[in-house]
Swiss-Prot record:
This is U-actitoxin-Avd11a. The keyword Ribonucleoprotein does not apply. One of its GO terms (molecular function) is toxin activity. Its main location: secreted. It comes from the Eukaryota. PROSITE patterns: SHKT. One of its GO terms (cellular component) is extracellular region. The keyword Endoplasmic reticulum does not apply. The lineage of its organism: Eukaryota, Metazoa, Cnidaria, Anthozoa, Hexacorallia. It is found in: Secreted; Nematocyst. Belongs to the sea anemone type 1 potassium channel toxin family. Type 1b subfamily. Inhibits voltage-gated potassium channels (Kv1/KCNA). Disulfide bonds join C36-C70, C45-C63, C54-C67. Residues 36-70 form the ShKT domain.
Amino acid sequence: LVVSVTSRRVRFWDDFERDENFEEERPYLRNVKRACNDYKSSSYCRSVGSRNECGIHKYRMYCRKTCGSC
């Protein structure tokens, strides 16, 4: 009996090194991808900030500008 254990298959969209090179070649895309914006409404993000929930990863990503994550 032979058992083979392998890690998950690498997919072409998992090529992180290629992604980094792509970002370096086109700096205008880097600025667009990492823009400092709130992705939820301003009232939603204000309430997150007032409840001091910026430490929770989900809220920090939704309200990057309000929580000061960028």
